């Protein structure tokens, strides 16, 4: 059926468009010679689908305006897919043949009977020296006498003990000694001396008001109430300072004798409930005092 599509833009029918697309398709196939070869790259998982599942309906609509053409969604191909694919050339036709593999090497064959391999590395190869252990920086017990400089800044390892004689003769010990002597014997700078002098002067002299306030200042006499309050406060202080005298206990009064008499005790009786206690009281005689060096006596006059 022939009807007009897109009037005002294109006067061709769909049948004419399909016929012209088929002609251009055949012309393109004839124009492609076997000498022109191109490398075909595909993904690892979808290479077979991309080679076989081509859509031809897009070619039939290539004469439509660009506004009405369906847009193809192109997938982003990773770099690893190109590197993992292997390219093989046919000796008779020189047409590339793609085989998807998961190997990290790609083999390329040409008309020459002897194939050669091209190693393609996705990541840079690691050096072989990384697996080796780093050299020990500590000094072993066998090498203590050798002239090997030791890194004294590192932590101490009890498996490889150090020697003070080796440390004393090392450059690190000499450097520490020179730095300490320089720190002790250094001359104080002028800025430090100026700061110290300012601190001393500020501690000796108090901070007074500015001279502009002193010129307008006037001295007022204290009022009579202030003088009386000061006098009363001084008298109160004198009164509290004088403490009352402590009554002295007379030696003649025997307090223990009075307490016994109140309890019913009489002279000549024994102590206790049945009056069988001590009748004669104990007397203390002061003979002297003993020290760590000598024994002295007290002579009562």
UniProtKB/Swiss-Prot annotation:
Q: Where is this region: Disordered?
A: 16-38
- Compositionally biased, Basic and acidic residues: which spans? 16-28
GO BP term, example: alternative mRNA splicing, via spliceosome
On the tree of life, the source organism's domain of life is Eukaryota
Per UniProt, residues of the G-patch domain are 252-301
Q: Where is the composition biased (Polar residues)?
A: 29-38
Instruction: Tell me which GO cellular component terms the UniProt record holds.
Output: cytosol; nucleus
Report a single Gene Ontology molecular function: nucleic acid binding
| Protein name in UniProt | Uncharacterized protein C2G11.04
């Amino acid at each position: 059926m022939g009807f007009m599509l897109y009037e005002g833009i294109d006067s061709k029918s769909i049948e004419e468009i399909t016929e012209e697309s088929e002609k251009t398709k055949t012309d393109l196939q004839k124009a492609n010679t076997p000498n022109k070869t191109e490398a075909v790259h595909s993904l690892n998982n979808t290479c077979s689908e991309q080679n076989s599942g081509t859509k031809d309906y897009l070619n039939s609509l290539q004469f439509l305006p660009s506004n009405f053409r369906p847009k193809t969604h192109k997938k982003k191909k990773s770099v690893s897919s190109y590197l993992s694919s292997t390219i093989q050339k046919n000796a008779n036709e020189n047409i590339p043949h793609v085989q998807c593999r998961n190997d990290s090497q790609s083999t390329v064959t040409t008309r020459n009977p002897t194939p050669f391999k091209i190693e393609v590395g996705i990541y840079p190869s690691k050096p072989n020296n990384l697996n080796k252990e780093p050299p020990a920086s500590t000094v072993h017990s066998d090498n203590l006498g050798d002239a090997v400089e030791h890194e004294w800044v590192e932590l101490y390892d009890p498996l490889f003990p150090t020697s003070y004689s080796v440390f004393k003769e090392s450059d690190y010990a000499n450097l520490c000694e020179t730095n300490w002597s320089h720190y002790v014997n250094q001359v104080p700078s002028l800025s430090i001396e100026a700061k110290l002098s300012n601190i001393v002067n500020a501690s000796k002299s108090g901070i007074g008001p500015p001279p502009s306030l002193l010129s307008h200042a006037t001295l007022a006499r204290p009022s009579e109430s202030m003088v009386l309050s000061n006098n009363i406060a001084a008298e109160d202080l004198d009164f509290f300072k004088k403490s009352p005298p402590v009554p002295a206990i007379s030696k003649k009064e025997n307090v223990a004798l009075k307490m016994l008499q109140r309890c019913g005790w009489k002279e000549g009786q024994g102590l206790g409930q049945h009056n069988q206690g001590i009748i004669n009281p104990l007397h203390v005689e002061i003979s002297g005092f003993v020290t760590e060096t000598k024994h002295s006596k007290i002579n009562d006059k």
